[in-house]
Amino acid sequence: MRMNLFNDVKLMRHAFLILAHNEFQILRILLSMLDDERNDIYLHIDKKVVLGSLEQDLFRLAKARLFVLEQRLDVRWGDISVVKAELLLLETASMKGPYDYYHLLSGVDLPIKSQDYIHHFFEKNKGYEFVPYSCGEANLKDLERKVFKYHLFCRYYKI
């Protein structure tokens, strides 16, 4: 258990679950922005990535604990493999947890707020979950493209 030395209040623990497959220079920035003693980071790197091509300092953090999953899946857009990789991250984190919050990110997401702001927000709203949605015209077109059209054989797409 981690304790805040200033007021003996238990610090909230956050698990950041990251699916990465490309743009590793952005992943490096993401990891540095999440490098906080209150965070543990779980990283799934797509099986198609040659690990030897990644710089080893990508995996060095000063404060957060980083767990790079040994089991790597070949993840394809729109395929069940995305869900399997997400579940693998969640199962791995829950075995090392518990955590107050689990955050699922891609390796190209970046937070727009500081870790102090994020942690304060979740402390203030402990016990609440936030599920965003939007119903604008542009979002409706994107929804129609993803939901109402068939995407057969996603496993064989070359991106």
How should these model regions be labeled?
Residues M1-I159:
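ER/Golgi luminal nucleotide-sugar-dependent glycosyltransferases, focusing on the catalytic module
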